[in-house]
Amino acid sequence: MKTKELTQSKIEEVSLEILLRHAVKAKHGLEKESMRVNPDGTLSGTTHPIHLGSSLTNHYIKTDFAEPQLEYATHPRPKVEANIRELQDLHIFTIRKLENELIWPFSMPPVLPEEENEIPLGQYGTSHSGRWKTIYRHGLGLRYGRRMQTISGVHYNFSFSKVFLRQFLGKEISNFTKEEISSLYLHVIRNFLRRVHFLTYLTGSSPVFDFTFLPNPGSLKFEKHKNFTLYSTYATSLRMSEIGYTSKVQDTLGIHYNSLEEYVDRMCYAVHTPYPKYVSFSENKDAQLNPNYLQIENEFYSPIRPKQIPKGDERPLDALLQRGIEYIEIRSLDIDPYSPVGVCRSNLAFTQLILLDSLLKVSPSISEEENFSLKENLNSVIWEGRNPELKINVNGSKRNFQEAGAEYSESLRHYAKILDLHTGRRTYQEAIDFQIKKWKNPDKTPSGKLLSEILKRNIEFREKGIELAQENKRMFSYLEYSPGTLMKMEKETIRSFQEKEELEKQEIQTQYPTVKLCNH
């Protein structure tokens, strides 16, 4: 059975002020990837530092694709400021455990080895879950290239509070159905996809990269600066472009968000159906988990994803089918090089306003035609976002992008005023003011600011990265932890190794868990 779409009349039944008062109580979580580098900006060749705990089982600090690619995760919290502070504590802890290394401040990678296979995959020990993680990463390298997988980013996890949902849906929490909650989050996801190009312009920080990332650009045209730097003049987020986290193979799958059933059905197809090119990779043992379009659900690239927390060895799709959507994961944020922790409060506050607007506006199903138009908008902004002449698709006609973006940002102000009224601060209105400046002057966007500085100072991308990384290291070396943080992190380091050892004592499983509830 398809879940019902929320209508504007349903939205208007509930007082906007009451809704927004409760919206302040949403839950937030942050994940951030960062490369460990040597003082000269080259990728670290060392294993994951033992003092940071096990990269398999530590709750706060793991590794992503590559062994030197740190992945931080904060607890879900009712105030995003607490997430940022926790992320800061994790950086302080890391810097004080690293001997002579730095944390790279950009989404685009540092100086990479000449041979792609010299980029070390994450290593997680001899347990079956640890081995699967490394095999999965080996498969990613075969499919998309190891260089591409070294791009890092920030993920913002968001869920509405139960009090907010009770007010919005007009019923007691005990009467919620998973279908209603899932429908609400899919409503938000569809509208977010209709607005994500605005967020990409405002937060994109990757218009430039080191040539070792893309030694042979092929037909893609980049400008060269000095000896080692390539850039695209008006680009905002090359991380989200075809040289980053996109896949033409995945684009053929037709995965949409019009209903949970449709989404899960297409994802089930993707994780169970072999793709001819990938079949050949499986000739070598442990080359990949399987030859399917997606080895596992996490391989799917999208600016936003519906999520449910799996239990034990449960697959994410089974978790979604059993319990519905619990939260959404926004994956379109570049690392902010002008924030030591890689993300700033103003950008997250503005993102929250977009999510609220996405909920409080009608959100019809996305047709194939609209899906094409939305992808065209996003791709245009990725490559030409700071071009003052850029036009995008808006309701079937072309509009100047910067005019449309400024107008949209200003339209969120009435939400911001109500939220600020209930928090007693001007956080949300200041977030809008912060973004409006970027619409008035593209050089104030992080992508414009970064590229302008590199060109005007006549320095290399790698030089700017080292400079920022050293500044951040000095700052984190002097900052104080939040109370109790050091003891908590030291205990987690010990606990993570104990759990890893227990996993390695268990009987080895030979097959990755299958999705039980798929019909494919």
Swiss-Prot record:
Cellular component annotations (GO), alphabetically ordered: cytosol
Presence of the UniProt keyword Metal-binding in the record: no
Signal sequence residues: none
GO biological process, one term: glutathione biosynthetic process
Enzyme Commission designation: 6.3.2.2
GO molecular-function terms, A-Z: ATP binding; glutamate-cysteine ligase activity; metal ion binding
Pathway: Sulfur metabolism; glutathione biosynthesis; glutathione from L-cysteine and L-glutamate: step 1/2
Swiss-Prot/TrEMBL catalytic activity: L-cysteine + L-glutamate + ATP = gamma-L-glutamyl-L-cysteine + ADP + phosphate + H(+)
The entry's keywords: ATP-binding, Glutathione biosynthesis, Ligase, Nucleotide-binding
Keyword ATP-binding attributed: yes
Record family assignment: Belongs to the glutamate--cysteine ligase type 1 family. Type 1 subfamily.
HAMAP family documented for this protein: Glu_cys_ligase
NCBIfam families xref list: glu_cys_ligase
Protein name: Glutamate--cysteine ligase
The organism of origin for this protein: Leptospira interrogans serogroup Icterohaemorrhagiae serovar copenhageni (strain Fiocruz L1-130)
